[in-house]
């Protein structure tokens, strides 16, 4: 029984990576008064609204149902039995969107870092595995979340390139330089 509880605890930690990253971005935005980090934070919030209708529409379909035995599947992994649709994994969408946007921005700023690519891949893979093992999502829902995250991350990156505000661009370089240190 202890082994099972430890396993569940570890799976919940890996499953919560998107929440930790969102809090990290919010902390950067507040502590450093950083407009780019605030932009990234709001894209994470906006993602929730984008996924609301697909989850609602497909909730009772075979594609949208959570696997049997799903438990603690909400944003904070503390929600008991889930009653929301599972199609398009929000956790996977969030972290894939964030890393896609950051990696594209770093590439354009000529500070691409393979370690960030490896770290992002590790976080995405471990989150996907934990969402699958906790029975919160099927493999299809996880992969669909990743594809949705890539599309939203690319869209976020394109929106960033349209913003010509000097402060935003300086703040963007500050955030990207944090990841350069890794």
PLM feature spans:
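Hydrophobic alpha-helical bundle signature of multipass membrane enzymes
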Residues: 1-133
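Multi-pass membrane proteins that catalyze or facilitate reactions on polyprenyl-/lipid-phosphate substrates
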Residues: 2, 45, 113-116, 120, ...
């Amino acid at each position: 029984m202890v082994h099972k509880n430890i396993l569940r605890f570890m799976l919940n930690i890996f499953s919560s990576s998107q929440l930790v990253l969102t809090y990290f971005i919010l902390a950067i935005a507040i502590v450093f008064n950083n407009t780019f980090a605030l932009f990234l934070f709001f894209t994470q919030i906006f993602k929730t609204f984008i996924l609301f209708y697909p989850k609602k529409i497909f909730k009772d379909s075979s594609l949208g149902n959570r696997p049997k035995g799903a438990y603690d599947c909400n944003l904070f992994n503390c929600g008991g039995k889930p009653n929301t649709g599972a199609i398009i994994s929000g956790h996977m969408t969030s972290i894939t969107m964030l890393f896609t946007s950051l990696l594209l921005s770093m590439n354009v700023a000529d500070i691409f870092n393979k370690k960030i690519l490896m770290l992002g891949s590790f976080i995405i893979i471990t989150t996907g595995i934990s969402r699958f093992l906790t029975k919160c999502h099927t493999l299809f829902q996880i992969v669909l979340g990743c594809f949705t995250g890539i599309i939203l991350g690319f869209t976020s990156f394109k929106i960033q390139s349209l913003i010509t505000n000097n402060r935003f661009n300086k703040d963007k370089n500050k955030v990207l330089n944090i990841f350069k240190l890794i």
